[in-house]
Regions:
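Surface-exposed amphipathic alpha-helical tracts and adjacent flexible/coil segments at the periphery
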Residues: 1-166
């Protein structure tokens, strides 16, 4: 095998990054010879907004049952992409977030980065003027949040923030 294709016409960079991360972990586990639990990896993929999974075009001539003509909308009730890390203040331990969807103090979020993922509760939020606010209002805004101690983001240009729902 030389490549894997992530299907979908309208997948965001968040979707592609998260899917590639799960695929990489699954490939590494399979190649190492350890017990391979595909349900663990599918559970991680199920957290992403999707229209359900089918065999798609795995086979050359696909029966209609293997295509998804029913659900035209991706949905997810577990996680939501809420922002992109734009810079990190290492002295203070805070990150500047370009907000994509609303989140608030107390929310459980997952920081996805090239160095690995970290789950934590948002303890505080500051707006662009450094004023403490209860929530990041939504797309088009920038806020700062404190990072967990000893956070290693790898390359922060590729770090994203996801909120856990329910």
């Amino acid at each position: 095998m030389h490549s894997l294709k992530i299907e979908g016409r309208t997948k965001s960079h968040y979707y592609v990054a998260r899917t590639a991360q799960v695929y990489r972990a699954a490939i590494d586990a399979a190649a190492s010879g350890v017990d391979f639990n595909d349900k663990e990896y599918m559970a991680q993929l199920d957290h992403l907004a999707n229209r359900g999974y089918t065999e798609g075009f795995y086979r050359r001539h696909v029966p209609q049952d293997y295509q998804n003509y029913t659900n035209g909308i991706s949905s997810n009730t577990n996680q939501q992409f809420v922002g992109e890390v734009r810079e990190v203040d290492t002295d203070r331990g805070w990150a500047l977030i370009e907000v994509k969807n609303r989140f608030e103090t107390g929310d459980t979020v997952e920081l996805i980065s090239t160095a690995g993922n970290q789950r934590f509760a948002v303890e505080a939020i500051e707006n662009k003027d450094g004023i403490s606010v209860a929530a990041a209002p939504g797309s088009g805004h920038f806020v700062r949040i404190p990072l967990p101690e000893a956070s290693d983001l790898g390359d922060p240009r590729y770090a994203m923030l996801m909120r856990h729902i329910g």
